[in-house]
Regions:
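Canonical tetratricopeptide repeat
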Residues: 99, 140, 173-174, 206, ...
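Register position in tetratricopeptide repeats
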Residues: 106, 113, 147, 180-181, ...
Length: 463
């Protein structure tokens, strides 16, 4: 178990202030934005000056991109327009560009639109063009790259950042990248540095994920509750994310009513929060309430139409008997393809036994970018779906290397072991998956039951 697990228990004895925003992938973005804006005392003076660019930077493409007008009537769109105006009036000062960059990050998080992370990265490029090549630009760039799943580039930038400055969010983004790449021990060490510097929602939520990732569910729940206790009522999305993660941990523990309460809390704090709706749909499916699950999952998939969301919706619709609508959703998954979530699409194809060569290709491409347990699992599953079970075996070993207690990892490992005639491990892993089968989608639970029956029949014939 990583050293972070031992050291966290000591830090829990400290007293904590009211904490701010956090998510695992982009956990600290809004607190940075709030701090930047709070420290900025510039007032807008209507008509005081011409807001058109009169600066050599106006010819630099990244600067033009980030100042381009965009449509939208939501409050976040007004924030972006205001920050763009301030950037123009400050002659593209680095602080103004930094605030604009974090506002784009906020927009990306609220809308699940990754194109705004691209704009945040362009803000960092524009900052550097002004000569501001210091840690503030590096943090913004590392954050954007990590959110865009450009992990190798992000790691390079994050390591450069922590070599020049050692603030909590610097270690946070480095840890995020390393965890995504499968470098769990290094990521845990970065998170420990973050905790030592600032024990708050952001650092404890990250530590909770590491606990879960390394098989300590109870520790993950304890730390996520600690993170939530330090959240601010003014920071709704952060607390909503933490409550959503807690709900999934509670569901895995079998505490379904507590899990529902956690999703209620998340949605009270942040209405239309797709991850909480997805989690709530999963819980309702586990409680055998598919019509209610469909309502949640329809909304979630509309807000964030990634393969995992639409897969859950299709399964829920099938359970209600609406197979025609389920087929429509499945067709949409294929039409959208794997551009936004190659790994998720690969898993879907392999589970359905469709276009397995594409599933392999997508998973292999992902593995060149990040080598975490979930990507190894995706490749193992795709190879097995294509009948290449011997090649799948080493990736199963990697997928289970952190002792992650995840129903999907265990399901895939058990089926692949059975296909490789390893009945002992097949029985063990399928049994472990069955203990937390509430974490699987209905089509996966069907596979689990079918393979457990096959193993049972095979063993009975040997007796």
């Amino acid at each position: 178990m990583p050293e972070i697990m031992k050291e966290i228990s000591n830090t829990r004895k400290r007293s904590f202030p009211s904490f701010s925003k956090g998510t695992l992938a982009v956990l600290g973005s809004l607190i940075l934005l709030v701090a930047l804006i709070a420290n900025h005392k510039t007032s807008l003076k209507a008509g005081a000056e011409n807001t058109s660019l009169k600066n050599p930077l106006s010819e630099f493409a990244p600067c033009r991109f980030v100042l381009a007008s965009s449509s939208g009537n939501d409050p976040i769109d007004a924030e972006i327009a205001q920050q763009q105006t301030l950037a123009r009036r400050s002659s593209m000062s680095a602080p103004a560009l930094e605030r604009l960059g974090w506002t784009f990050v906020k927009k990306a998080r609220l809308t699940f639109d990754p194109s705004y992370y691209n704009l945040a990265e362009q803000c960092a490029a524009c900052m550097e063009a002004t000569g501001a090549q210091g840690p503030d630009a590096l943090l913004l760039r590392a954050h954007a790259l990590q959110s865009l799943h450009r992990f190798k580039e992000a790691e390079t930038v994050a390591r450069q950042l922590t070599s020049t400055r050692q603030r909590p969010f610097d270690y946070g983004v480095l840890g995020d990248v390393l965890i995504d790449e499968g470098k769990v021990r290094e990521g845990a060490a970065a998170y420990q540095n973050m905790i030592d510097l600032r024990p708050d929602l952001q650092s404890y939520a990250r530590a909770a994920h590491v606990r879960w990732l390394t098989g300590d569910l109870n520790g993950a729940i304890e730390l996520m509750k600690l993170a939530i206790s330090g959240s601010s009522s003014n920071d709704g999305e952060a607390a909503a994310w933490a409550y959503t993660r807690l709900a999934l941990y509670q569901l895995q523990q079998g505490a379904t009513q507590q899990a529902l309460q956690s999703t209620d809390a998340a949605l009270t704090l942040q209405s239309n929060y797709a991850p909480a709706m997805l989690a709530r749909g999963r819980i309702l499916l586990a409680l055998r309430r598919p019509p209610e699950a469909v309502v949640e999952l329809e909304h979630a998939a509309k807000l964030n139409p990634l393969p995992e969301y639409q897969w859950a919706l299709a399964d829920a619709l099938a359970l209600t008997g609406n197979r025609e609508r389920a087929r429509e959703i499945e067709s949409q998954i294929v039409e959208r393809g794997g551009n936004e979530d190659p790994r998720g699409y690969s898993l879907y194809l392999a589970t359905r036994g469709e276009n397995t060569e594409l599933a392999i290709q997508l998973a292999q491409q992902e593995l060149t970018n990040r080598g975490d347990v979930f990507t190894h699992d995706a490749l193992a599953w795709a190879l097995a779906a294509a009948g290449r079970t011997t090649e799948a075996h080493p990736h199963v070993t990697q997928a289970l290397s952190e002792r992650t207690v995840d129903a999907r990892l265990l399901l895939h490992a058990g089926i692949i072991a059975a296909l490789n005639n390893d009945t002992t491990h097949a029985k063990q892993w399928l049994q472990e998956a069955s203990l937390i089968q509430q974490m699987l989608w209905p089509s996966e639970r069907t596979q689990l039951e079918a393979w457990r029956q096959k193993i049972s029949t095979k063993l009975s014939h040997k007796e």
